[in-house]
Amino acid sequence: MIRKRSLMSDICENKRRKLICGDSESSIDALPSDTKSALSYIASSFPTEKFTNKFPPIVLRHQIYAFVKCRTDVDKELNELKNQGELILFRIGERNNQLAIIYTNDYTQYIDRSCRKSPVIENFLKKVLAVCPNIKYSNTVLRTDYGFCEEDIAELIQQGVLTLGQDVGWYWLSIPRVGEFMKTFLYGRRAILQHVRRTKYKEILLNELQQRKLPKKALLGVSYHIYDIIGSDAVNKIETSSGVMLRLLTEHIRI
């Protein structure tokens, strides 16, 4: 009988087996089973040093879904952490519901490095983001409530702190040079899905996929993309007598 099982139990069990067999990879004593712990776990493995622009750890919201079963609880806790000023959420990609997460301190430090102490951006961080850490802002609110003029807003967009929203007069919070991250992320996603797609039945054991190598341009690493494809429902995760199996969903067979 096939039954569901938590991702982290599977991954950690595989890592413990490697340790017993002499692999250099360390075992994990505490398994993240809540939103905050899962966020910290994923962020801690983000390869900042591999990026020219030294991105801060970027975690996709749906990656946390691979660890925590109840997505409503994840969304609720992330929103609470955002309102408490611990992290920021921003849209990434073309879909409105695809969100990324960065710790607030990491975000502000990265902005300081990237934007060369711009007075407009410093004003935005202190007067807007620190007080009202929203995912998007209206032109009216920025001008009326916070005193930004059109030239200021244009600079925020030019520097990559804001991006134009689909609705007229609205702007999404963003991060400078996010396009570089997205290019790398999508490249790695395609690469790891190719490993699954090339198998005979479009399925692969989790511990086998963890051992696969990605191209050098896939900077984010195998684990990062495993959390992605499970959390985004690109694959179904099922348990078999041989271990956890990842099975590609029909709509992802040809990408």
Predicted features, each with a name:
Residues M1-I255:
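Non-catalytic recognition/regulatory regions in large multidomain proteins
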